[in-house]
A protein has these predicted regions:
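N-terminal secretory/membrane targeting signals
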Residues: 1-35
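C-terminal ends of transmembrane helices
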Residues: 64-72, 113-118, 159-173, 268-274
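Alpha-helical transmembrane segments of multi-pass inner-membrane proteins
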Residues: 42, 46, 50-51, 55, ...
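Alpha-helical transmembrane segments of multi-pass membrane proteins, especially transporters
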Residues: 56, 76, 80, 84, ...
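Membrane-interfacial helix-loop connectors
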Residues: 100-103, 109-137, 143-152, 160-164, ...
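Membrane-interfacial segments at transmembrane helix termini in multi-pass membrane proteins
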Residues: 276, 298-335, 341-360
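Helix-loop-helix hairpins and the membrane-proximal interhelical loops
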Residues: 35, 39-85, 89, 179-224, ...
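Hydrophobic core segments of alpha-helical transmembrane domains in multi-pass membrane transport
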Residues: 21-29, 51-65, 96-100, 157-166, ...
C-alpha cells in the first residue's frame, strides 16, 4: 500500500520547475536586453515572445504551486476517498471529479488509479468511472481562470507569500501557498494578455485565428500543443486568454478545448510505458473515452455554442470585438464544463463495455 501512496508524489517535478523558472527569468530579462539592441521591429517581436513564455511559465508554476498546496492540505484524505468511495460507477465518477478538482491534475488521478488496480484494490470497471469523472474535475481550472480578477493578482501573491514565509502554523503556510499560486495564475494570464494585445492589428495572426473556426484544425492544434506541454489546463487557460483579446470565436474556443481533452492523454500514455498491463489498459481507456467524446460532440459544436450563450452572462452594451472579448471567456469555460459533464453522463453506462474492450 505504501508503494501505491508514493505514486501521489509528482514525477520529475524538479526538471519541470527548473524549466518554468528559466522561462520566467528569460521573460523578465528579455525587455532590457532587446531595448538595448536598437532594432525596434525585432525588439517588439522578441519582447512579445518572451512575455508570452514568461506569462505561460508563471501560469504553469502557479498551477503547480496551488496544486502542491492543495495536496498538502487534503492529500491523505483524497487518497482514502479514492480508494474507498468507488463502489459503483457513479460514485467512481463523482470521486474522480472531486479528487481531480482538488489536486488539479487528471493525470495524477489516473496514475493513482493504476496503482490501486495493480494492488487489487479496484477493478478495471470501477477505475473507468474514476477516469471519466476526472475530466469533470479539470473543468474547475477553466472556470477559475475565466474570472477577470487580474488586478488583484499581485495582492494575492503578496498576501500568500507573507502567509507562506512568516506564519508559524503549517496550515496557514499551506493556505498561503494556495493563494500565492492562484495569484500567479492570474498574473501569468495578465502578462500573456498584455503580450498579445498588439496582435489585434496584425492581419496574418487574425487570419490564422480565423482558421481555428474549422473544428478539425482547432482540435488538432490544441491536441498537439497539450501533448507538448502535458497540461490541458494550460491549453484551456491560453484559449481563454486569446478569447479575452477577441482573437477567437466561441466555436473556435470549443474546438480548441476539445483538442486539449485529447492531448492530455499523452501524459497517461507516456506514464504507462514499461508498466504492467493494467497500467496500459487504464491509459488506453483514457484515450478511448476522450476521443469518443470528441467524436460525439464535434458535429454539435454549433448547438453547444448556442446553449452556453443562452445561459452565460453577456454584455449587450458592448459591440464588435469588445463584446466578443467580454463574453467569450466565460462561455468557453461553461462549454468546457457542459461538454465534460455530458460526455461522462453519456458513457457512464458503458463502463463494463469499455473494460471488456481493453481486456480483449
Amino acid at each position: 500500500m505504501q508503494a501505491i501512496l508514493r505514486l501521489w508524489q509528482p514525477c520529475n517535478s524538479t526538471p519541470r520547475t527548473a524549466l518554468l523558472v528559466f522561462a520566467m527569468l528569460a521573460g523578465i530579462a528579455a525587455g532590457p536586453v532587446l531595448a538595448a539592441s536598437g532594432d525596434t521591429g525585432q525588439m517588439e517581436w522578441w519582447n512579445m515572445a518572451m512575455k508570452l513564455f514568461g506569462g505561460l511559465a508563471l501560469f504553469l508554476f502557479g498551477m503547480e504551486q496551488m496544486a502542491d498546496a492543495l495536496k498538502a492540505v487534503a492529500g491523505e484524505r483524497m487518497k482514502i476517498i479514492l480508494a474507498r468511495l468507488t463502489t459503483n460507477r457513479f460514485m467512481g465518477a463523482a470521486t474522480g471529479a472531486f479528487v481531480t478538482a482538488v489536486i488539479q491534475s487528471s493525470s495524477v488521478t489516473t496514475v493513482l488509479v493504476v496503482g490501486f488496480i495493480t494492488a487489487g484494490l479496484m477493478s478495471m470497471a470501477q477505475s473507468i468511472g474514476v477516469i471519466m469523472g476526472a475530466n469533470i474535475g479539470t473543468t474547475i481550472t477553466a472556470q477559475i481562470v475565466a474570472f477577470k480578477v487580474t488586478k488583484a493578482a499581485l495582492l494575492m501573491i503578496a498576501v500568500g507569500f507573507s502567509m507562506l514565509s512568516f506564519s508559524k502554523q503549517e496550515k496557514i503556510k499551506q493556505y498561503g501557498g494556495m493563494l500565492m499560486g492562484l495569484g500567479m495564475i492570474f498574473f501569468g494570464m495578465s502578462v500573456m494578455s498584455d503580450a498579445m494585445s498588439p496582435l489585434r492589428s496584425y492581419q496574418p495572426f487574425l487570419d490564422l485565428m480565423a482558421s481555428m473556426d474549422n473544428p478539425l484544425i482547432g482540435i488538432l492544434v490544441a491536441a498537439v500543443f497539450t501533448g507538448l506541454v502535458q497540461s490541458s489546463s494550460a491549453t484551456t487557460g491560453i484559449v481563454i486568454v486569446m478569447a479575452s483579446q477577441g482573437f477567437i470565436s466561441l466555436q473556435a474556443g470549443i474546438a480548441l478545448a476539445f483538442g486539449a481533452n485529447i492531448g492530455t492523454c499523452v501524459t497517461a500514455m507516456l506514464a504507462s510505458i514499461g508498466k504492467p498491463r493494467e497500467a496500459v489498459r487504464a491509459a488506453v481507456v483514457h484515450v478511448m473515452f476522450n476521443v469518443f467524446g470528441v467524436m460525439v460532440w464535434i458535429g454539435l459544436i454549433g448547438h453547444l455554442a448556442e446553449f452556453v450563450t443562452w445561459f452565460s452572462p453577456s454584455h449587450p452594451e458592448l459591440s464588435g470585438v469588445d463584446r466578443l472579448a467580454a463574453d467569450t471567456p466565460r462561455q468557453i469555460a461553461n462549454a468546457h464544463t457542459v461538454f465534460n459533464i455530458a460526455t461522462t453522463l453519456i458513457f457512464i453506462g458503458f463502463t463494463g463495455q469499455f473494460a471488456r474492450l481493453v481486456e480483449w
